């Protein structure tokens, strides 16, 4: 099932992380993980693009407030393959979210609106197996 999945009671607090495991469809053009208040307000929109919107093998991150996008941050690290398993960990620090990959690579994205905890998570384009918090 690569349809969207949403969790509305995530309650991810600073200092904790959420780990997402799944598999990337063989014909995947891109997949996204969103963390935030709700579907209109994202602290982080994490979009891995194999071939989407003119980006090839790029990670594009952004924030969204009241359905308005912020400024994009592009990353060169791209530890994903179509048809492969994926594991990504998102660690919420008050001022930033650290994105960690099973490859050992990591980068961070600034938190533009601090929340006491992150209630909302959604996935698009990924056949997910598990979502765990620690």
Curated annotation (Swiss-Prot):
UniProt KW Acetylation keyword: yes
GO cellular component: extracellular space
Ligand binding (a beta-D-galactoside): 45-49, 53, 62, 69-72
Keywords of this entry: Acetylation, Extracellular matrix, Lectin, Secreted
Pfam family, any one: Gal-bind_lectin
InterPro entries attached to this UniProt entry: ConA-like_dom_sf, Galectin-like, Galectin_CRD
Compartments (UniProt record): Secreted, Extracellular space, Extracellular matrix
Primary location group: secreted
Molecular function per GO: lactose binding; laminin binding
UniProt domain Galectin: residue ranges: 4-134
Modified residues (N-acetylalanine): 1
Role this protein plays: May regulate cell apoptosis and cell differentiation. Binds beta-galactoside and a wide array of complex carbohydrates.
PANTHER family registered for this protein in UniProt: GALECTIN, GALECTIN-1
Subunit field text: Homodimer.
Stated name of the protein: Galectin-1
Gene source species: Rhinella arenarum (Argentine common toad)
């Amino acid at each position: 099932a690569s349809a969207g999945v949403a969790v509305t009671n995530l309650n991810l607090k600073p200092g904790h992380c959420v780990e997402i495991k799944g598999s990337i469809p063989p014909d995947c053009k891109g997949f996204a993980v969103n963390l935030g208040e709700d579907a209109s307000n994202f602290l982080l929109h994490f979009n891995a693009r194999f071939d989407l919107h003119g980006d090839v093998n790029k990670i594009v991150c952004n924030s969204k407030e009241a359905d308005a996008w912020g400024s994009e941050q592009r990353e060169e690290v791209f530890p994903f393959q179509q048809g492969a398993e994926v594991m990504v960990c998102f660690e919420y620090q008050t001022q930033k979210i650290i994105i960690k990959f099973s490859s050992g690579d990591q980068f961070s994205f600034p938190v533009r609106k601090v929340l006491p905890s992150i209630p909302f998570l959604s996935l698009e384009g990924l056949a997910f197996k598990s979502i765990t918090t620690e």
